[in-house]
């Protein structure tokens, strides 16, 4: 939360807040005086209104049913109108992913980093907030998950990382990543 407040003090706008929920978080231990840390914030910050929003859609639970809507006319009388519901709806702002070996990535080298991001989380965020050919910037590249998914989704990537060890992990992951023959559209 402090990061969002800091960037807002620099003139960025907080456009959206989402939650990354870990289905199988690392246990805190019996002697710990706090609950298991099972979620993290995802902040979408921008200088202006975001130019891109490609929401992840899911089939609406009751999309096949009509809805009765009340509407009060100018004369004060209540009118009931049957309307068609949308067949699809945007997903909730809580994104749940399993983490750890066999879940976050199949790249064994990535686990040399202590806190890797699930590839599906990176894929979902990149697909939502960018278009094909856009540039993705990750100021904390870590094990290179954002870099890998950006390139597989046909985005350009720029990143920074202080640790030369983590830069080497990223380099190896990108060298091993399959080349996208067919690019996904949004």
Language model: regions and residue ranges:
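Positively charged, low-complexity nucleic-acid-binding target-recognition regions
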Residues: 175-186
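Core catalytic lobe of class I
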Residues: 1-177
